[in-house]
Amino acid sequence: MTDQLSLRLEPELPRLPGDLRPMLPRSAPAAFDSAEHLFEPSWGGERVLAFIEPADRAHLRLLDGHGRDLADLIPELADLPARILARSAVVDGELVVVDQTGRADPEGLGARLRGEAGPPVAYLVFDLLALDGRPILREPLFRRRQLLRRTLTPGESVVAVPAILGEGIALHTAVRAQGIGAVLARVRASPYLPGVRSRLWRLVEAAPIETSGADHAGVAAGGQSSLGLAADGTGLRAEGGPATAPVLALIRRLPFDEEA
């Protein structure tokens, strides 16, 4: 599908939830600053849309980009419906497995997605697509993120990924130092375009900077945070569980001054 750079070029949006597919970024050659973009870390995990159904609050579907339901493979996310403060919702994020430094473990994630035993999986949520039966795909990104922070209660396996406005180069430098795979840059006023690979979202790869083990060893979720973020639904004040504690600890080492 061709790029969609404005609402006027936006295709007719599918009815939720059956035919919804993730919006995809285009690559960017280098890090950049922009007052029009929100920047957030990306671990390069498995993109998954989570559907919390209105008819049965205990029912959860986790659909990958091919429409395959992964919910039975990830039982640690069974409590996600209880963490959504709404009758129903659809959220977008990535499934990841990380090591004790917070770096992605693609082999561990692959094992879990094949139904094999393996380390715990975390769901890193960064967008809200529908709330209480109402699609909000046309709402600007910053508004969807505001609603996400009010709606999602983080847990042992769920984190709401923070973003920073404007300072993409600084975040990219920090992400490289911490061994995270990429930075996702999204136009803060952008709608959500299901199934579209759009320049409204750009992915900047971040080849890790090799550092001594001491730079990453001993990262603990209970450590001192430099973020200055309120406990507003991002989960950054929480200690997390086995799947999310290393992620939270690593996020605390990134240059987030406020929630965008």
Predicted region positions:
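Catalytic cores of nucleic-acid ligases and guanylyltransferases
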Residues: 1-260
